[in-house]
């Protein structure tokens, strides 16, 4: 009886408890930057130039989460530092870390899953570190700590967390 009720509830609410297993990381060419709750002021061109990447977590033709990465060889404490470091790393071809400077989700569970997929991507690309450039908000702090990151730097306007690879 309980199984029948659970199945009915899932169908009624269109809940797929295993959907994250079927989701995949895809590179995106375009996004609506106004949806970004962390850094909506960063335009699409900036997010894509100097080898920066935008990834989505795709499930059944829908993007469930988005993460933006830049690649550097040092930990930035501001968006300006991130800009300069990622430009230098592109020209010197010496980037050894991914900097996740924004991540957001459209469905419960998608934020955690996209970070897991970003870590897999970093391993495939032989990067040494995955570090965030996060705002000083309780939401950002809880998200990263809950997902296994460690706080490595507390700055005037940002904080950096590191995920282990």
Predicted segment positions?
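A short, internal acetyl-CoA/4′-phosphopantetheine-binding micro-motif in the GNAT/acyltransferase core
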Residues: 98-110
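Conserved beta-strand-loop-alpha-helix junction that forms the acyl-donor binding cleft
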Residues: 131-142
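Short, high-confidence coil segments that cap the C-terminus of an alpha-helix
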Residues: 52, 95, 124-127
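Short amphipathic alpha-helix that is part of the acyltransferase structural core
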Residues: 1-49, 54-59, 63
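Conserved catalytic-core motifs of GNAT/GCN5-like acyltransferases
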Residues: 133, 145, 150-163
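Conserved acyl-donor/pantetheine-binding loop and adjacent beta-alpha core of acyl/acetyltransferases
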Residues: 68-99
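Conserved acetyl-CoA-binding loop-helix of GNAT-fold acetyltransferases
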Residues: 107-122
């Amino acid at each position: 009886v309980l199984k029948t009720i659970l199945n009915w509830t899932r169908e009624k609410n269109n809940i797929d408890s295993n959907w994250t297993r079927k989701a995949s990381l895809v590179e995106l060419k375009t996004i609506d930057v106004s949806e970004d709750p962390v850094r909506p002021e960063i335009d699409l061109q900036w997010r894509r130039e100097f080898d920066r990447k935008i990834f989505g977590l795709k499930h059944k033709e829908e993007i469930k989460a988005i993460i933006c990465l830049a690649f550097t060889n040092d930990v930035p404490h501001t968006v300006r530092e991130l800009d300069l470091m990622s430009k230098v790393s592109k020209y010197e071809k010496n980037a050894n870390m991914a900097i996740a400077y924004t991540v957001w989700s459209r469905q419960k569970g998608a934020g955690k899953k996209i970070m897991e997929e970003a870590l897999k991507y970093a391993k495939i690309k032989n990067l040494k570190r995955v570090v965030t450039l996060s705002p000083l908000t309780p939401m950002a702090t809880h998200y990263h700590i809950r997902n296994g990151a460690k706080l490595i730097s507390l700055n005037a306007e940002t904080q950096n967390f590191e995920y282990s690879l």
